[in-house]
Amino acid sequence: FGEDEAQLLTQRTLKVLRHRFVGAPPTVEQVQDVVEQMLVDANHTKTFRAYATYRDQRHRLRQDKRTLVDVASSVEEYVDRADWRVQANANQGYSLGGLILNVSGKVTANYWLSHVYPPEIGQAHRDADYHIHDLDMLCGYCAGWSLRQLLYEGFNGVPGKPEADPPRHFSTALGQMVNFLGTLQNEWAGAQAFSSFDTYLAPFVRNDGLSYDDVKQHMQEFIYNLNVPSRWGTQTPFTNLTFDWVCPEDLREQVPVIGGVEMPFTYGELQKEMDMLNRAYIEVMTAGDRRGRVFTFPIPTYNITADFPWESENAERLFAMTAKYGLPYFQNFLNSDLSPNMVRSMCCRLQLDLRELLKRGNGLFGSAEQTGSIGVVTINCARLGYLFKGDEKGLFARLDHLADMAKDSLEIKRKVVQRLMDDGLFPYTRRYLGKLRNH
């Protein structure tokens, strides 16, 4: 058709748009819907088909642009500190490592949203209906590891990498723990945790015949080394330790093994050594570094049980540290049907009831300490409350839908991470974990 017909159709389109969209401008898709309607009403079938094809091509181009990362702006926004992500993580400073992580993170996040998740799941994140955490990492969220396994087997088993036998001394055990946590942190987005820190290390203190000053010196080295920003992005490894304080019942009669040799004592006979370890840890954390700055990691969790020694000197030190820095988490087992061996605290977002995992078999030490989280999704409840004010039924219907999508996103992530693990992308995780059945 000619120019006059085009002008007429344009005027009709503008009239419809002004009538339909009062007070808010229409979207690109809404404008194109009206254009198609005008072409159909005017019996311009050939033009309608051509326009529909053009529209589809432009839609695909817009989607592709959303996936592409502008290289120049990505680098310059970080260097100029114009990107909000520069200040998004208190554990990451402005640095070359931070720049590398920031740029690669944008690529990885777009890969998740546009090429892994279904369109509806990715769009819900982009529209802020919920937030899928750690999209900048192509891996799982957090993991709790078996300290007993590391001490019994040593840090080894990955082809082409240095291998170490099981540690025979306290200092060696701490050194392997630092290497283990730092290395595994590179294969996970979030926290790395060990449970029963004081229980499992007490045999090394007894066997080496260490004095308290010796223990404290080694503890200083251990804590300092865990706070060095050696993680990708020039970050400090996010580490957690759980302290039993008193030997758990399920370990009291068990005999420790050091370097393949059974010791002439049980875990339950080592309360003195456990007290030394707890005192050393608390005093080093309370003192901080050479400038008195608090050590951020490892974050301690203390199990509060019926036999917790409230009036002891160590308890005084513990609560003085808590008052000064607010460092520890406390796991309260008083008046609870749970016992310390039934719960593992992984990080600030995750606590696991191991009774649920034990239903899947393998026994306590086959599953309990090798647990964690695939990922975290936060639903935008504030928006739901605003949108569905006075409509409780509608609110819960929408919440159910978002929760289902969040669940689906995590199940998809589980399959992706497991496949990548099987293919060797996470060699140390495959060596010490193997499967994500308890995550």
Where do the PLM segments sit?
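Charged, amphipathic alpha-helical regulatory modules used
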Residues: 1-74, 78
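Conserved catalytic cores of very large enzyme subunits
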Residues: 57-439
